[in-house]
From Swiss-Prot:
N-terminal signal peptide: none
Primary role: Conjugation of reduced glutathione to a wide number of exogenous and endogenous hydrophobic electrophiles.
Organism per entry: Pseudomonas fluorescens
Subunit relationships: Monomer and homodimer.
Name the UniProt record assigns to this protein: Glutathione S-transferase
Similarity annotation: Belongs to the GST superfamily.
Length: 30
């Protein structure tokens, strides 16, 4: 909760990753 901006970016990143996984798109973590 201290770094709201960083948390928001991480949240968005996770949402994108979940969306790709749902579509069955291969996703490699960087």
């Amino acid at each position: 909760m201290l770094h709201l901006i960083g948390f928001d970016k991480l949240y968005s990143y996770n949402m994108v990753k979940l969306a790709l996984l749902e579509k069955g798109v291969p996703f490699t973590e960087v």
